[in-house]
A protein has these predicted regions:
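C-terminal regulatory/oligomerization modules of transcriptional regulators
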Residues: 1-9, 31-47, 59-64, 81-120
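Short helix-coil-helix linker/hinge
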Residues: 16-21
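Pre-recognition alpha-helix immediately N-terminal to the DNA-recognition helix
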Residues: 23-25
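Short alpha-helical segment immediately N-terminal to, or the first helix within
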Residues: 27-29
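Residues within the DNA-recognition helix of helix-turn-helix
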Residues: 53
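Alpha-helical DNA-recognition elements
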Residues: 56
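Short, Lys/Arg-rich nucleic-acid/phosphate-binding segment
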Residues: 67-76
Length: 120
């Protein structure tokens, strides 16, 4: 089976979110857009390390980078909420699967007799 583009996007998002530092960066950026320096201070990370993490988040489409009109050197980072939709959709499918499995298990546990099985 050929992977779909959505599969690549989902894999990139999960890969980017697999790192605790990047998840913390996302949490901070959900509060408000931030400059790289401010973000580095919040997560106590060197500018070089922060740059590597931001590159992964941008490549996955989870974070965008914007310039400031008056100063081309200043970069503002913000979360791209729409990039999380494939993750949310996949999680909803998994949740639905588990809900159905647990309902079936509950029904079996509440009525253990199967048709054609002798009473004990």
């Amino acid at each position: 089976m050929e992977p779909r583009p959505a599969d690549f996007q989902l894999s990139a998002a999960f890969g980017a979110l697999s790192d605790a530092s990047r998840r913390e960066m996302i949490r901070l950026l959900l509060q408000k857009p931030r400059r790289a320096g401010e973000l580095a201070e919040c997560v106590e990370m060197s500018p070089q390390a922060l740059s590597r993490h931001l590159r992964v988040l941008r490549k996955a489409g989870l974070v965008s980078e914007h310039g400031v009109e008056n100063d081309a050197r200043v970069r503002i980072y913000s979360v791209q909420a729409t990039a999380f939709q494939p993750v949310q959709q996949w999680m909803a499918q998994v949740e639905d699967l588990w809900r159905r499995q647990l309902q079936a298990f509950k029904a079996l546990a509440e009525n253990p007799r199967r048709p054609g099985r002798p009473k004990t």
